[in-house]
Amino acid sequence: VLSGMYNPKKTTPAVCEFTDIDGLVKGASKGEGLGNQFLANIRETDAICHVVRCFENSDILHVDGSVDAIRDAETINLELIFADLETVENRISKIEKKAIQGKDKDAKLEYDALKPIQEALSKGLPARSVELTKEQKVLLKNFQLLTNKPMIYVANISEGDITNPDNNKEYVRLK
């Protein structure tokens, strides 16, 4: 559409690449399941598209034994929060002394950006919920915090629910 409007010399199509990363289970931040490998794969993404199971099927086992979309979404979110909290706390412990003494300006800037993130994560809130200055956002980009990435939830419903997804109680709970 834009190429037709502006007639550029070259048209580069937009690309949205999805990578299916299996393996995040409760305890992943402590190395369970694919654990750290899984988390490292997510760090490389620009956004997270979380597909949440909202259908019943006895032929497809659920890792927790039952379908509960809210529980499953919260499990993933908590694992991402735990992983980020570990990253942030490790970094704070390395720079805190220099930052508080005021001898290192960069350490102070980093500390001032990380401290509110740590507080939010400790309360179970994602890093993206913290208001930061433009400078702080640039500074934190290097940490590749998982909960700072945009999150899109996709309800995986049965084919029978496609025409009227509101009949699916898990979908309704998730939306």
Residue ranges and their predicted role:
Residues 27, 60, 79, 91, ...:
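Active-site-proximal flexible loops/turns
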Residues 94-175:
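C-terminal-of-GTPase-core extension/linker across diverse P-loop GTPases
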Residues 1-50, 55-70, 74, 132-143, ...:
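Switch II of P-loop NTPase G domains
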Residues 17, 46-53, 69-95, 113-125, ...:
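Conserved beta-strand/loop subsegment of P-loop NTPase cores
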Residues 36-40, 86, 112:
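A generic "alpha-helical surface" signal
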